[in-house]
Amino acid sequence: MDAATTRVGLTDLTFRLLRESFADAVSWVAKNLPARPAVPVLSGVLLTGSDNGLTISGFDYEVSAEAQVGAEIVSPGSVLVSGRLLSDITRALPNKPVDVHVEGNRVALTCGNARFSLPTMPVEDYPTLPTLPEETGLLPAELFAEAISQVAIAAGRDDTLPMLTGIRVEILGETVVLAATDRFRLAVRELKWSASSPDIEAAVLVPAKTLAEAAKAGIGGSDVRLSLGTGPGVGKDGLLGISGNGKRSTTRLLDAEFPKFRQLLPTEHTAVATMDVAELIEAIKLVALVADRGAQVRMEFADGSVRLSAGADDVGRAEEDLVVDYAGEPLTIAFNPTYLTDGLSSLRSERVSFGFTTAGKPALLRPVSGDDRPVAGLNGNGPFPAVSTDYVYLLMPVRLPG
């Protein structure tokens, strides 16, 4: 599905297709187009009609996206038009068939009684999209979207620290581990997939923004295929390919060293607590109303209860008490409310388990499963061994006043 190989008849492309499928494909490709492209043609989407249907492509030298759409190709060819403009137009069109025809250096688009005439850009100046590396493995689309969203939330956004803007992807046979950190929190997700080879082994760093967009926009279909190569050449192309359901994208890998994260995960806790996620999120939002942006929310844990509080005398104070299953000595700890709610929302669980060491060390959040031993059944005041789970969110506390 390489659009570059089918650029023929550059001035006579004519096709008809359904508005919904056209709008979906154009929008998906246009999402990754640069707002300020280095050269004008990179703001365009390439429409290529052939015997295989319509191919819609976008590329900015870092990220490529390509979607195959069923269409009635009256006359094959290619045309390059503004991606943002075409996306806006196709999403606003009535739900009727769309006719597209290239007329000289303009493209005519008709849908119902609506007609548009758009300028084109030189197809010959458009770069060739990269070829996908060999397929490395596949996993269900829903699992891919969930896992990426769970770890991308913890990735950094400071481009001066590229090692923190990526998601580390570790592959060991049928097991994949995803990890991301911005130094204030760390998210790790482990999952199983169908590897192309049982002995495949690789570790790469992928831009979190690109993976998050891919997960959010969705490839669709039942499976997502990841392509990094096979054998000893895994990751050597410097590209990750993601494909499925007629869509494919590539992104350049980050050439940076991800922090050694496993040594940060505690193996035991001095105190543990479990509580309702939705109830806790609502309480955090409530008390944080009197906290300055990014200010702390304090949590005072004792047997059977936790008190959330925020604010100060000059801006106002707020507190709320919640029921909690707690084991360990009484503990007061504070967190950034945004980072805390991010972690709670990413658990995909009705209840959360907190594992604590001290008020000055990171807390470990994990989803509570039906196999969990009740906190009330734990003896003594610790230490309590960390429970193995497929997702953890490690969060640095905020220094308490005084």
Swiss-Prot record:
A biological process from GO: DNA strand elongation involved in DNA replication
Alphabetic keyword roster: Antibiotic resistance, Cytoplasm, DNA replication, DNA-binding, DNA-directed DNA polymerase, Nucleotidyltransferase, Transferase
Gene3D superfamilies: DNA Polymerase III, subunit A, domain 2
One of the Pfam families matching this protein, by short name: DNA_pol3_beta_2
GO MF annotations in UniProt: 3'-5' exonuclease activity; DNA binding; DNA-directed DNA polymerase activity; identical protein binding
Signal as UniProt keyword: no
Subcellular location(s) per record: Cytoplasm
Domain of life: Bacteria
Main location: cytoplasm
CDD domains xref list: beta_clamp
PANTHER family: BETA SLIDING CLAMP, DNA POLYMERASE III SUBUNIT BETA
Extra remark beyond the main annotation: Strains that are resistant to griselimycin occur at a very low frequency and are associated with amplification of a 10.3 kb chromosomal segment containing this gene as well as the ori site, suggesting antibiotic resistance may be due to overexpression of the wild-type protein.
Entry similarity comment: Belongs to the beta sliding clamp family.
Subunit structure and binding partners: Forms a ring-shaped head-to-tail homodimer around DNA which binds and tethers DNA polymerases and other proteins to the DNA. The DNA replisome complex has a single clamp-loading complex (3 tau and 1 each of delta, delta', psi and chi subunits) which binds 3 Pol III cores (1 core on the leading strand and 2 on the lagging strand) each with a beta sliding clamp dimer. Additional proteins in the replisome are other copies of gamma, psi and chi, Ssb, DNA helicase and RNA primase. Interacts with the tau/gamma subunit (dnaX).
Protein name: Beta sliding clamp
Organism: Mycobacterium tuberculosis (strain ATCC 25618 / H37Rv)
